[in-house]
Amino acid sequence: MKIGVFDSGVGGFSVLKSLLKAQLFDEIIYYGDSARVPYGTKDPTTIKQFGLEALDFFKPHQIKLLIVACNTASALALEEMQKHSKIPVVGVIEPSILAIKRQVKDKNAPILVLGTKATIQSNAYDNALKQQGYLNVSHLATSLFVPLIEESILEGELLETCMRYYFTPLEILPEVVILGCTHFPLIAQKIEGYFMEHFALSTPPLLIHSGDAIVEYLQQNYALKKNACAFPKVEFHASGDVVWLEKQAKEWLKL
């Protein structure tokens, strides 16, 4: 089965990595809109337009399913993309919410949503969590993580300063942290380590990873089986420098 994966840049690699590990598909077309990253600082109308343009990009590739591996686009453009598509278009928010529903039984557990400014302002996660009965939800726009990750700054003083800036003011320590941007799993270990060290936690918070969540969602909703395709083919495209994107993919995905 041939599918597409769409993201604003390299953040979708976290989803792609999970898909490749699960071996669900034999061919994956990855499109990163790297010329216009980040999406998280742009207005909803612009993001919807970017989503529709991504649909146009994938049409000649004759894919059977499109994964929107971008939380901002999933929050603001998914519905519009689904209206204009003849194939299934799947976002990353619903799978993440269902993963929480499976793993977090305490409806009063403190949940922290990390995301871009646009994702947080959309209230997509907050509303979906409240519909599932979760009452103790807070959110934090951590948009500065995106350009750092796009520049491959995955550790060191800059990232530490950024985490300190965002996390020091937290008044309630979360038991669950939603990595509400597909860039963020690329620094998940650093986020977990920061919480453990600076808040003296005995156990780390549960991190909800879009990539892992969407693999389980696809298996349940599209009758897909793990390890069905041992050697999936991956093809990379970008609105910006595709050579740079491929280089990042080789480094991060070990292709």
Swiss-Prot record:
Claim: Isomerase is one of the keywords in the record: yes
Annotated keywords: Cell shape, Cell wall biogenesis/degradation, Isomerase, Peptidoglycan synthesis
Reaction(s) the record says it catalyses: L-glutamate = D-glutamate
Enzyme class: isomerase
Enzyme Commission code(s) on record: 5.1.1.3
Pathway: Cell wall biogenesis; peptidoglycan biosynthesis
Active-site residues, Swiss-Prot/TrEMBL: 70, 181
Gene Ontology MF annotations: glutamate racemase activity
GO process terms (BP): cell wall organization; peptidoglycan biosynthetic process; regulation of cell shape
UniProt-listed PROSITE patterns: ASP_GLU_RACEMASE_1, ASP_GLU_RACEMASE_2
Isomerase among keywords: yes
Residues holding substrate: 7-8, 39-40, 71-72, 182-183
The protein's role, per its UniProt record: Provides the (R)-glutamate required for cell wall biosynthesis.
Family: Belongs to the aspartate/glutamate racemases family.
HAMAP family reported for this sequence: Glu_racemase (MF_00258)
Protein name (Swiss-Prot/TrEMBL): Glutamate racemase
Gene source species: Helicobacter pylori (strain ATCC 700392 / 26695) (Campylobacter pylori)
Gene name tied to this protein: murI
